[in-house]
């Protein structure tokens, strides 16, 4: 019987099977090969199975019964705990380099630059389950009607994602350590990625206002990257100076974008000047209100509301002949990591369901890495091999996951 179309594509484009087979593992006398374990977890994540227990069921008597064969949940957890996370990171970097060679990072709007976004997300928390790598915090919550203070164990990860491409491509993740903040974790991830991928792999970094700090900005510039970061109240001196220089908000027409650019605004904390772009965007939308009349009867009324949003973006980018609206485009591209990466991986990729955790911190790291790899390669397959064949494609990632699982269950005969 012919191999699955998804696996054939990954082998043809990325030589994926050979790379997975070369991954080192720490088991001495394994009953099942490391590639078999990796394939079960990876394909389970691609089919959007939420837990290792579900993958065990599918391997025994479900869609993977012929492709993988019987595997227990304990076997999967034991093997994942003995994979080296650095080796999985090296695999991810090799795939990222191949993506760049294949032109996946090209963009119609980024003016030849490869733009990456960095952000963090909490993936799990518990008052009971924990591992040696868990972070801790004290939380007040209600238990049996009483307000109690308990230690909560949780994990956060930082993610670097290319956002200038046609679809977001995560480059790497890093688990935040106990006592480490999100900015320090993200900076360590950036440094490790560029050390492995090369200093010219990325051109520009976009981030939320949390990252607009003097040490982080200096470290990013030392890596050779330009940056565009949201400017908010966490830098009050810079924000006040930008508001003083730039004009106040005008009367914007519906759907109109107003933009002001100050190429040199003094940043007192760093004793330097940075560029600041201010945008005012007015959006007109209709909403429905339900009101009651004098007799208490409900009446639906529609009204038009004009919503105005103001944003500031700080940057070290030398625009030259490039219009300042480019800074606005870069700043808004940061939302891709929230709306398309974190949200999709949480709802469809089950990022926040750590099916292996208690006492197995390394297994959780490797499981999360494999889920991110599965999400990335499924996106590549979906956009380059599925959507590209349709003029108007109505399929989504959930539809693709169901079809992948069905094709494993009912393989097509080889016509060769």
Question: What is each stretch, according to the model?
Answer:
Residues 28-96, 164, 220:
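Short, positively charged, Gly/Tyr-enriched micro-motifs
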Residues 3-39:
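Basic, short loop/linker segments at the boundary and entry of helix-turn-helix/winged-helix-like folds
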Residues 1-4, 16-21, 255-272, 346-416:
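A short, flexible helix-boundary coil/loop motif
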Residues 40, 55, 72-76, 112-126, ...:
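Short, conserved catalytic/metal-binding motifs centered on acidic residues
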Residues 77-165:
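Active-site-proximal, Lys/Arg-enriched surface segment
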Residues 138-201:
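Electropositive, glycine- and tryptophan-enriched low-complexity nucleic-acid-binding patches
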Residues 229-334:
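An anionic, glycine-rich sequence signature occurring as long contiguous blocks
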Residues 6-9, 55, 60, 321-357:
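Short amphipathic alpha-helical "interface-anchor" segments enriched in bulky aromatics
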